[in-house]
Design a protein with these regions (language model features):
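Histidine/acidic residue-rich metal-binding segments in metalloenzymes
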Residues: 1-12
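His/Asp/Glu-enriched, well-ordered alpha-helical/loop segment
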Residues: 11-12, 17-87
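C-terminal cap of metal-dependent C-N hydrolases
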Residues: 30, 81-131
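Short C-terminal domain-edge/linker segments immediately following a structured domain
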Residues: 2, 41-47, 114-121
């Protein structure tokens, strides 16, 4: 937390790594590392924002990675390609197998009510509304 606040840590990533059931339903020391995390990542960030301002956290997985990798920042202007997410940091949602978008189900947050809801993702001319 201190590293993010003081700028030592520049980027936070989800490290989304789905695993099939067979690689997880075994003794702990034999199980493959990794969980699904893309779908719950924003909710985890909102939880962390109780200790770190949300605007700082948003930069760690949006503009800062692009800056480090030399990727041009997106802009919202006429003629530019859209690339942004609409979210509600106060919204809540229930994460269960019915709403899970992954082929895998290895998540510690399965069947939890989570705070911080992604409403839609806009990329180019495509809009994906999240229900």
């Amino acid at each position: 937390i201190d590293g993010i606040k003081d700028g030592t840590i520049d980027v936070i990533a989800s490290h989304h790594q789905p695993q099939d059931v067979d690689t997880k339903k075994c003794e702990f020391e034999k199980a493959n590392f990794g969980i699904i995390s893309i779908q719950t990542f924003f909710s985890n960030i909102v939880e962390l924002s109780r200790k770190i301002p949300l605007d700082i956290l948003l930069k760690t997985f949006s503009s800062k990675p692009k800056e480090i990798l030399g990727i041009e920042r997106s802009s919202i202007s006429e003629g530019s390609k859209a690339s942004f997410t609409i979210f509600n940091s106060d919204g809540s949602w229930d994460y269960d197998e019915k709403i899970n978008l992954s082929k895998s189900i290895n998540s510690p947050w399965l069947n939890w009510s989570l705070k911080g809801r992604v409403e839609a993702v806009i990329k180019g001319n495509k809009i994906k509304e999240i229900i």
